[in-house]
Amino acid sequence: MKEKLLIRLFVESDAGAVQDIIHRGLREVNGKDYPAELIEEHCAYFTLEKIKSQAVSAHMYVAVSGDKIVGTGSIAPYWGSEKESILLTIYVFPEMIGEGIGSAIVNTLEQDEYFLRANRIEIPSSITAIEFYRKMGYAFKNGLCIQKRHDS
């Protein structure tokens, strides 16, 4: 990554770029671990309307390098709880994985008010991203999800 990375809150005009990042991440990265039909179901789920809706119910961030959005991630209350939060849709352009963008997004989410007030963080992680979250200090729960506990 040559340009300085800026992480900022999502604005509605970011939806198309965010959708592209999510779809490419699903197809090019997660597609190695999941059947094509499941990947396409997930791509169909992430419509522009769904992304805009998630940005209303969550705090959605985008990572910008130069004038290009290169990553995204969100945090929201977990089922409306003030003591638990959930990290959602953390994706980076496939060709930029390993450049620290995903870590920068998670670090930003960890400074968000939803993270800071929570006693527990849930991440519905893909198989593909498990090792990334482990490196970020998260651990398995029930062999499926990932969680991180901290003092509030």
Locations of regions flagged by a protein language model:
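Short alpha-helical functional segments enriched in proximate histidine and acidic residues
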Residues: 25, 112, 132
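Acetyl-CoA-dependent GNAT
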Residues: 5, 9-13, 20-95, 106-108, ...
